[in-house]
């Protein structure tokens, strides 16, 4: 209050326009006052404070005034500080509360009456109207609430679909499918033609995928495709075993396998003679060429005949061939493990050329001989100790 009255007194003594509403009319003449007022009015801005801070300041300035009255005056002036102070001063003077502020002033001089008249008089027609009040960005009643509310969430964005666009395309409009190309018609589908074959062979195995295998058969030939895959895999396994010459010699020494192979060959010849009568004459002349070849090179002819018989093996013969191949692989592994554990002297005693051709019986003989020598060594040592 002291600073407010000092500002009013300084405005009246110097003739400035920063005091109350009519402070410029006391210093100059009647012609220059409106001009000074017009020059200084645009520079004056309406001061607004935060609601709680303004209420605390006004309550400190006017302790004898009710809190609700101060709030009503502040809301009536839309938060303008200067207008609220003017009205509160006027109300305080009318209520007879001016003596409370005289004690707090720096000097005991009373307020000049002209200052009070200029401060409390209503706006004259000569002055400019006050600027248009612009409401604050925040709501005035927001400070009355005990807790501040969160700002409202914006509504979700809804894309307006086109009239002819279906719901599925509207949902996945931003999905970019990978460039895989067009899939075949029977991809992940069971055609009606395949139902009979699947029901007829419920235990059939699924075809395996391989890079070097035969081309896949069409959909209706699912069972034929399974059989072709099985045949292809069996042929590959047989070809790997038949590349080993030692395994080929073991097959030629196996009597049961040779009998089964001959039985399959005769069955194949009988089926071939029934299907094609002209092939019987050609087959009849075939054995005549065999003796000629056997005389020139009997080893090559026997190998060629044996390999030709292997082409016409039946299922039982193939099964026996796999059993022999499994036994041969196990025997080879055992033989390699024995070579690693044998002493160096015994490994040097065997010839390098016959190291891979040792039979299982010969391996047992060497092992028994080695064990016998090891058992004789402690007996000799005990005899020498007893003699000493």
UniProtKB/Swiss-Prot annotation:
Residues 290-300 have a biased composition (Polar residues). Residues 50-93 form the CUE domain. Pfam families: CUE. One of its GO terms (molecular function) is ubiquitin binding. Residues 11-29 have a biased composition (Gly residues). PROSITE patterns: CUE (PS51140). Residues 1-10 have a biased composition (Low complexity). Residues 1-45, 152-178, 196-225, 270-302, 369-388 are annotated as: Disordered. This is CUE domain-containing protein 1.
């Amino acid at each position: 209050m002291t600073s407010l009255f000092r500002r009013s007194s300084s405005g009246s003594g110097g003739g400035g326009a920063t005091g109350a509403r009519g402070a410029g009319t006391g210093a100059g003449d009647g012609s220059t006052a409106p001009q000074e007022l017009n020059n200084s009015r645009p520079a004056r801005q309406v001061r607004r404070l935060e609601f709680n801070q303004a209420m605390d300041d006004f309550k400190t300035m006017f302790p004898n005034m009710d809190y609700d009255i101060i709030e009503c005056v502040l809301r009536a002036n839309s938060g303008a500080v200067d207008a609220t102070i003017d009205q509160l001063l006027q109300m305080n003077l009318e209520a007879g509360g001016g003596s409370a502020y005289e004690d707090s002033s720096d000097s005991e001089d009373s307020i000049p009456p002209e200052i009070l008249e200029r401060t409390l008089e209503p706006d004259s027609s000569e002055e400019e109207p006050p600027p248009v009040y612009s409401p604050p960005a925040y709501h005035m009643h927001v400070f009355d609430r005990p807790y501040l509310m969160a700002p409202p969430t914006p509504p979700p964005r809804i894309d307006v679909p086109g009239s002819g666009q279906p719901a599925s395309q509207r949902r996945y409009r931003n999905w970019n499918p990978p460039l895989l190309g067009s899939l075949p018609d029977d991809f992940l589908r069971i055609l009606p033609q395949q139902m009979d074959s699947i029901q007829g062979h419920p235990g059939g195995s699924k075809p395996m995928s391989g890079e070097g295998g035969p081309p896949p058969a069409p959909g209706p030939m699912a069972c034929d495709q399974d059989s072709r895959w099985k045949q292809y895999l069996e042929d590959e396994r047989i070809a790997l075993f038949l590349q080993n010459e030692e395994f080929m010699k073991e097959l030629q020494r196996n009597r049961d396998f040779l009998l089964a192979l001959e039985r399959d060959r005769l069955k194949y010849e009988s089926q071939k003679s029934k299907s094609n009568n002209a092939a019987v004459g050609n087959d009849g002349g075939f054995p005549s060429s065999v003796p000629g070849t056997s005389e020139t090179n009997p080893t090559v002819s026997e190998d060629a005949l044996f390999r030709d018989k292997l082409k016409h093996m039946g299922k039982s013969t193939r099964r026996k061939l796999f059993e022999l191949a499994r036994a041969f692989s196990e025997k080879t592994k055992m033989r390699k493990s024995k070579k690693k554990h044998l002493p160096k002297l015994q490994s040097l005693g065997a010839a390098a050329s016959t190291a891979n051709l040792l039979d299982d019986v010969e391996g047992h003989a060497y092992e028994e001989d080695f064990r016998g020598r090891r058992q004789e060594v402690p007996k000799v040592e005990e005899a020498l100790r007893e003699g000493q």
